Amino acid sequence: MGKSSNIVFDRIKEERQMLSFFKIFQRADLSSDCMRALPYSFISKVSEKDFSYKMVIRAQWGKTWDVEVSKNPTYYYIETRGWDLFVSDNALGQNEFITFTHRGNMVFHVNIYEQNGLEMRKPRKFQTMGPSSGIKKEEGENSLIDVKKEEESDESPGRAEFLVRKKKTEDSKSSKKKMTRNKVKKKSKSKSKQVLDGVPEFKITIRKSYLKFLAIPKHFVDDHIPNKSKIFTIRHPNGGSWKVLCLVREIRTIFSGGYSKLAREFPLMVGDKCTFKLIKPFEFVLLTSKKNREKMDQCMID
């Protein structure tokens, strides 16, 4: 007991003599420029000998993440690719308090403290999937309740709307259904024309908070999203794409890291009707309706 206490004390004493900084990982701000920035008061004290644009983040259980450091005219910051992997691997975003202690040569040891104040000493376990159901029964029942609530309130502005179409493969199709599919294909004027009718999709009306992060409907998550946080590609129908972190949580799943950049550059506006089509296992094409936007612009002109 006494020996263990001395080891902890010696570690704290040693780390107090090293340069360090902390960050609080909030769900809506996981990959913002501010979140990835290295504090000026910290970076100004790192010697030229110790500094490198190659940075290593090391957890207590030994896992490491290689990240790139870049510089703009104002500050140094961590590139999103390695940062988002660190965030997703540790399922961060629940107001964790994390210290970054510089051990030299841009190697940082991190200590992760959960919202309850306890230190995380081993990686979080992601929810396990059953061989047939694809998700634990209890979580599936909760998902149904959440979706029902969304469906009951979808008349209010900004509420998530949900639609999943399953591809029909039967040979004996009625001529009426074939005509309907042909009409849908003719209406498509972009790259989405290559997407067959029946691909999984969900619809969202953009509200203010959805310019920072986006909650994905539960039914869609259960049917089409893996049970572990992953990086997805979201494409513009006219070209261009963004890497976005799909952060999986027991309560809900969201697009977080990289999503706010997508919202700025696409661009998305409050009131836009958006359709996310899952064209590949980890790739969406995003379609938007500009009717509301055109009305808003017209009102401003008038």
UniProtKB/Swiss-Prot annotation:
**Keyword hit for Hydrolase:** no
Localization (cell):
Nucleus
- Residue ranges with Basic and acidic residues bias: 135-174
Write out the entry's keywords from A to Z: DNA-binding, Nucleus, Repeat, Transcription, Transcription regulation
Q: Name one Pfam family in it.
A: B3
Give residue spans, biased composition: Basic residues. 175-192
- SUPFAM superfamilies according to UniProt: DNA-binding pseudobarrel domain
- Record-linked InterPro entries: B3_DNA-bd (IPR003340), DNA-bd_pseudobarrel_sf (IPR015300), REM_fam (IPR039218)
Please state the protein's primary subcellular location: nucleus
Q: What is this protein called?
A: B3 domain-containing protein At3g17010
The organism encoding this protein is Arabidopsis thaliana
Q: What is the lineage of its organism?
A: Eukaryota, Viridiplantae, Streptophyta, Embryophyta, Tracheophyta
